[in-house]
A protein has these predicted regions:
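An N-terminal-biased, well-structured beta-alpha scaffold segment characteristic
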Residues: 1-100, 223
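Hydrophobic Val/Ile/Leu positions in short beta-strands of Rossmann-like dinucleotide-binding domains
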Residues: 6, 152-154
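C-terminal helix-to-coil terminal segments
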Residues: 23, 93, 101-112, 268-331
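Conserved beta-strand positions in the Rossmann-like core of class I SAM-dependent methyltransferases
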Residues: 34, 177, 243
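A short, aliphatic-rich alpha-helical micro-motif
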Residues: 45-49, 68-71, 147, 201-205, ...
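Rossmann-like adenosine-cofactor binding region
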Residues: 62-63, 181-277
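Phosphate-binding beta-alpha-beta segment of Rossmann-like dinucleotide-binding domains, i.e.
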Residues: 95-97, 103-151, 163-171, 321-322
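Glycine-rich Rossmann-fold phosphate-binding loop(s) that bind the pyrophosphate
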Residues: 157-158
Length: 331
């Protein structure tokens, strides 16, 4: 019987196990399921030697090839996240290991968080809250921004970006521009979006929201040059991955008021340094990478991971494969 390893934190499992009990029971009929915490790299290597599928191994990127050489039976890595930049995809592909994320199961939570940041920044909500808690009342009231009828620009229009677009169009009557070299115009139109080059999106949008995975091509794709293209009244939001944005360039743009404000949930280094300039700025709202942190997204993530591993073991094509070319090879 093939072995599946879920190294999930005990506290998280206490919340999700009851809901996922039926899914786990189905998986246990076809696989030996090991659910336990693993705390050291040595333990990861030892426990993974005879594993067929594993969820979210916490292996340093630089050690992935060594890990894969040890895990000789491994055929599937299933993340418990949308992002997969922590996994050496090239090494996995070479070894014939398919890597899957959890696709759209977190999309609604992230899209809602994106809009929470947009609205907070546009209406100075957090800023007003700080003034009130400090005993004050007066704030620069005339400097809030209405969103109705404005232009929303998306960098990436997949499951999350598409949901952000639909909310902007239906709730605020916004025009939608999107840059995504991997999406066809017909797909963008489903979300009411018009595709454009990145420069056009940045120049013409009143709100710019980033929804792209972190890859070598997207690292620092938003830097000083890109911030200089934006309107001084623009709101910039990132709920994708921190290194997609040059954080120093963002801080400089905010400090010099090249943009109106920003809402940031992801950072180049996490946790964020206590000395980060973003912690001290009034025109930025920051949250600690919590855009996907809802009970619903949490539950759906684990259910999605369990069921996708079950699909793979049963010989079905798994959902959300990142390196699809592996699936064409015989297992």
């Amino acid at each position: 019987m093939r072995k599946v390893l879920f190294p999930w934190p005990t506290g998280e499992l206490a919340e999700v196990t009851e809901d996922a009990k039926t899914d786990l029971e189905a998986l246990r009929k076809v696989a030996e399921v090991d659910i336990s915490q693993i705390s050291t790299e040595k333990e990861w290597f030892e426990r993974s030697r005879d594993v067929y599928a594993i969820s979210s191994p916490r292996i340093p990127f630089s050690r992935y090839r060594d890990f894969l050489n040890e895990a000789k039976e491994l055929k599937m890595i299933q993340t418990a996240s949308i992002g997969y930049n922590h996994i050496d995809i090239a090494a996995c592909t070479e070894k014939g290991v398919v890597v899957c994320n959890v696709g759209e199961v977190m999309a609604e939570s992230v899209a809602q968080h994106t809009w929470a940041l947009i609205l907070d920044v546009s209406k100075n909500i957090s800023r007003s809250d700080r003034v009130m808690r400090a005993g004050g009342w007066e704030i620069e009231r005339r400097f809030a921004i209405e969103l109705y009828g404005k232009t929303l620009g998306l960098v990436g229009i997949g499951d999350i970006g598409g949901r952000v677009a639909l909310k902007g169009k239906t709730a605020f009557g916004m025009s939608i521009l999107a840059y995504d070299p991997y999406v066809l115009p017909a797909r963008a139109q489903l979300y009411g979006a018009q595709l454009a080059d990145l420069e056009t999106v940045l120049r013409e949008s009143d709100v710019i929201s980033v929804h792209t995975p972190l890859t070598p091509e997207t690292q620092h794709m938003i830097g000083s040059k890109q911030f200089n293209l934006m309107k001084p009244t623009a709101i910039f939001v990132n709920t994708s991955r921190g290194p997609v944005v040059d954080e120093a360039a963002l801080a400089e743009a905010l400090e010099n008021k090249k943009i109106f404000g920003a809402g940031i949930d992801v950072f180049e280094q996490e946790p964020v340094s206590p000395t980060s300039p973003l912690r001290k700025m009034e025109n930025v709202v920051i949250t600690p990478h919590t855009s996907s942190s809802t009970k619903e997204a949490f539950r759906n993530t684990y259910k999605g991971a369990i069921n996708n591993i079950l699909r793979f073991i049963e010989g079905k094509r798994p959902n959300w494969a990142v390196n699809r070319e592996v699936l064409t090879a015989k297992r």
